[in-house]
């Protein structure tokens, strides 16, 4: 069993920063130029689902988050150059990700799951709200780590143009 440091170790990535949470909704495609344009003024917090698209577009996230317990989640990061990008992994997320993620990995504990709450309390760590969504978890992390502003990109909460995800992310 691999011991993972707790995600508050990288809270400075978010503290007093303008954090852009990037989801894999179809609207992300039209926002890629804006992400490039403002890259130096924002902290990009990407869901695992969109990380590959961002990297292929030359947009390197400041952090990536994965919360899903499904065993195939490793496919979101397999083959990506993530050596310098911290990953926040929810305590109940698929451990398969650890076999393929090349960069530093930090654990986040969630409210609503007793074992995670107990561990967080025992070690003095924060526990985060998930709302059943990776973007909700990312939002609570950004807020608890005192982000100045939080902006959503690609968090559509709808079928934009009849699509549930961005072009290249449809089946991952």
Where do the protein language model's features map onto the residues?
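Short hydrophobic/aromatic-enriched beta-strand-loop microsegments
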Residues: 43-46, 60-70, 86-89, 105-110, ...
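Short, polar loop motifs at secondary-structure junctions
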Residues: 48-52, 89-96
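Glycine-rich phosphate/pyrophosphate-binding loops
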Residues: 50-68, 142-166
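Active-site/ligand-binding-proximal alpha/beta "capping" segment
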Residues: 96-157
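Long alpha-helical, hydrophobic tracts
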Residues: 42, 62, 130-133, 162
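Conserved small/polar residues in nucleotide/adenosyl-binding loops
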Residues: 170-172
């Amino acid at each position: 069993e691999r011991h993972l440091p707790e995600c508050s170790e990288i809270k400075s990535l978010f503290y007093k920063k303008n954090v852009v949470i990037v989801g894999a909704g179809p609207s992300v495609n039209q926002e890629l130029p804006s992400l490039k344009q403002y890259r130096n003024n924002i902290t990009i917090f990407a869901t695992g689902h969109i990380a590959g698209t961002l990297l292929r577009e030359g947009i390197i996230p400041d952090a990536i988050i994965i919360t899903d317990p499904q065993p195939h989640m490793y496919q979101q990061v397999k083959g990506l150059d993530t050596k310098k990008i911290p990953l926040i992994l929810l305590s109940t997320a698929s451990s398969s990700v650890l076999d393929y993620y090349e960069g530093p990995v930090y654990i986040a504990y969630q409210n609503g799951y007793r074992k995670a709450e107990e561990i967080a309390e025992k070690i003095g760590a924060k526990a985060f709200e998930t709302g059943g969504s990776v973007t909700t978890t990312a939002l609570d992390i950004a807020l608890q780590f005192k982000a100045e502003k939080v902006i959503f990109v690609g968090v559509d909460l709808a079928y934009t143009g009849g699509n549930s995800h961005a072009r290249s992310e449809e089946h991952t």
